[in-house]
């Protein structure tokens, strides 16, 4: 009887055998993908399609109502509203290109969409009509990643038309950052009055003189003088910060614009000229940035000090992500800072073989953070980054793979418009601890007995006359049409402070006076071009004995080169031991914005 009672509590199964197992919610993780794949197959083969969509130029697409309704509120309303279209076998859509409709349908059946500069705006328009925000956001993300001085105004106008907040904000941010380049473009003249004001009325405008803002307004006005003259007083009132302009410039303003300025002052009312906020670009200061520097109070963690030599102030820049070391560093002609490759420090004190990384990052000045960019095709430590012919090149370096340490021949090129890396012709010889510079659309690479040049247009490497004293781990920079190569290590591992200059036009090396340096201070040097002059940043270590105890002290100094007298002069010494510099520290020079950095001293 008891057994019968137990059986009565069991759950019946399809074959009649009772089961005491609890119910389970089984799920096939591939079910949704499988259905989508089958729907795509039926779409491609025209099976069970029940609606034909006609777009511009009479192009038609046979598809499934339920799929269209599932991804688009526009189609769902069309097919379920009870209106004429809900029963028609064919519907016509106005304002959608055939390629855009094909891309929308491909997204509906596969969740994928292929974007190009040629199709992205038309696809965004179609997604706007069909109310598919996921496609709009993908298009916006693509346009943001492909902003440049030539297209940024057009993208901003496009975003403003469709009311896409992020695309509008990011394109406007880019325009302000690259303002002087952007205002030269023809699209700048197409801005409406309100769009122009929204760009110019900002503290974040990257101009070093307020006169640039005034000149951009005049250029915009002269494009359509009759229609735009009435707007000048309002634009001047909202956008020009006259206290920041030179009196001599204001005095030369033509009477026509002076009258508009007078009206603008009436519209604006009285203001406190002493409290006029400077634009972001007016606060920029050229600084020397030291990478691979460890703060003396934080163990071995890296910090990135920035030295304002003119004012004596010291700031701190956001350290590279993942504490990357021995990265390739580049400051572009547009003052963008890039780092690539490197390695992440090991937790092991005895580990010397580091895993190479393929990271690529760009520094965002306004937020003091690093933005991720497409990874290198080849991981590499200590590569050299060079800007040439509008593109960036990652050259050589080393990895720890297979049988140990290997130098690299490989070279890759980054195109910011395409936002991707491509492989180019490798160097004839593998190189690490090398140097690379650019001059007149050619790249020059130096290491020991090898001196190479690269022509990007021909994708070709060639050999040049090597330096008279072959050295590795030296320092190179272009100065006054010559490549200076300073210091380094010769074949017997002896450190040298030889200075040579290569006249690029004459293909000739000339010895200069050695850099005066005492070997006993164990110096490490870095060569930079600061304020258009050649400088050496020197880390010196002195060891003293006090009461039978060895003590070390370090000094970081800056020496300026006088090419007429052929001599070096100390012009700056850093504050005493704010940080320590490792042997592999690197220096770069860029214009930075103090209010965006953390002040140290």
UniProtKB/Swiss-Prot annotation:
Residues 49-117 form the BTB domain. CDD domains: BTB_POZ_KBTBD8. GO terms for cellular component: Cul3-RING ubiquitin ligase complex; cytoplasm; cytosol; Golgi apparatus; spindle. Its main location: cytoplasm. One of its GO terms (molecular function) is ubiquitin-like ligase-substrate adaptor activity. GO terms for biological process: neural crest cell development; neural crest formation; proteasome-mediated ubiquitin-dependent protein catabolic process; protein monoubiquitination; regulation of translation. SMART domains: BACK, BTB, Kelch. Belongs to the KBTBD8 family. This is Kelch repeat and BTB domain-containing protein 8. Residues 7-22 have a biased composition (Polar residues). Kelch repeats lie at residues 336-390, 391-441, 443-481, 483-532, 542-588. Residues 153-252 form the BACK domain. Keywords: Cytoplasm, Cytoskeleton, Golgi apparatus, Kelch repeat, Repeat, Translation regulation, Ubl conjugation pathway. It comes from the Eukaryota. SUPFAM superfamilies: Kelch motif (SSF117281), POZ domain (SSF54695). Changing residue 405 to K: In a breast cancer sample; somatic mutation. Substrate-specific adapter of a BCR (BTB-CUL3-RBX1) E3 ubiquitin ligase complex that acts as a regulator of neural crest specification. The BCR(KBTBD8) complex acts by mediating monoubiquitination of NOLC1 and TCOF1: monoubiquitination promotes the formation of a NOLC1-TCOF1 complex that acts as a platform to connect RNA polymerase I with enzymes responsible for ribosomal processing and modification, leading to remodel the translational program of differentiating cells in favor of neural crest specification. Gene3D superfamilies: 1.25.40.420, Kelch-type beta propeller, Potassium Channel Kv1.1, Chain A. It comes from Homo sapiens (Human). Pfam families: BACK, BTB, Kelch_1. It is found in: Cytoplasm, Cytoskeleton, Spindle; Golgi apparatus. Component of the BCR(KBTBD8) E3 ubiquitin ligase complex, at least composed of CUL3, KBTBD8 and RBX1. Residues 1-25 are annotated as: Disordered. InterPro entries: BACK, BTB-kelch_protein, BTB/POZ_dom, BTB/POZ_KBTBD8, Kelch-typ_b-propeller, Kelch_1, SKP1/BTB/POZ_sf.
